[in-house]
């Protein structure tokens, strides 16, 4: 059945949105894995766990916004299998944050490609949507992760376990309580 509201919404953009939904859900899944790793009794970094749980919820919300927009434009949502995170263990907080930064860069690159596609197909609605809800937020997220990585290294992580504990308690504790 064809949508009666669809206008100036190219099928390539529709398909790319479905792929972006999958990428956002994958990112949410990775952050969920990280959260519950740091919540384990043998890791016990509760603020890392809270931080990554918050990130997971944020990524899921990004996916939901895209799904809602897909429907508003008369597109069709086709969910795909969500890939399992590449790992189940995170050696330390620094490594998890470095993986998070790479994940955010990958998500950002995908959003930039979606923006280019929407520009190429002369779709100002999709361009505006991405600019309003995603592009600035991605840059801020990457900056925050970069700052966290720098500060953890400055404190002596990963070789200094106390650095990770203090970072968890003082930096993540005050940011995300």
UniProtKB/Swiss-Prot annotation:
Pfam families for the chain: Ferritin
Further information: There are three types of ferritin subunits in amphibia: L, M and H chains. M and H chains are fast mineralizing; the L chain is very slow mineralizing.
PANTHER family recorded: FERRITIN, FERRITIN HEAVY CHAIN
Binding site for Fe cation 1: 24, 59, 62
Organism the protein comes from: Xenopus laevis (African clawed frog)
E.C. number: 1.16.3.1
Subunit (UniProt): Oligomer of 24 subunits. There are two types of subunits: L (light) chain and H (heavy) chain. The functional molecule is roughly spherical and contains a central cavity into which the insoluble mineral iron core is deposited.
Protein name stated in the entry: Ferritin heavy chain, oocyte isoform
Record family assignment: Belongs to the ferritin family.
Gene3D superfamilies, alphabetized: 1.20.1260.10
CDD domains given in the database record: Euk_Ferritin
């Amino acid at each position: 059945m064809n949508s009666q509201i669809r206008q100036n919404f190219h099928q390539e953009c529709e398909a790319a949105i479905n792929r972006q939904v999958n990428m956002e859900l994958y990112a949410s899944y990775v952050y969920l894995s990280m959260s519950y790793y740091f919540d384990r009794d043998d890791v016990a970094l509760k603020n890392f766990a809270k931080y990554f749980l918050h990130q997971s919820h944020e990524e899921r919300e990004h996916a939901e916004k895209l799904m809602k927009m897909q429907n508003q434009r008369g597109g069709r949502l086709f969910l795909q299998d969500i890939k399992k995170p590449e790992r189940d263990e995170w050696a330390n907080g620094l490594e998890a944050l470095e993986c998070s930064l790479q994940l955010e860069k990958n998500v950002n690159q995908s959003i930039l490609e979606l923006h280019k596609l929407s520009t190429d197909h002369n779709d100002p609605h999709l361009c505006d949507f991405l600019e309003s809800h995603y592009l600035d937020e991605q840059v801020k997220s990457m900056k925050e992760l970069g700052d966290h990585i720098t500060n953890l290294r400055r404190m002596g992580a990963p070789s200094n376990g106390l650095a990770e504990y203090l970072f968890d308690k003082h930096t993540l504790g005050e940011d995300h309580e």
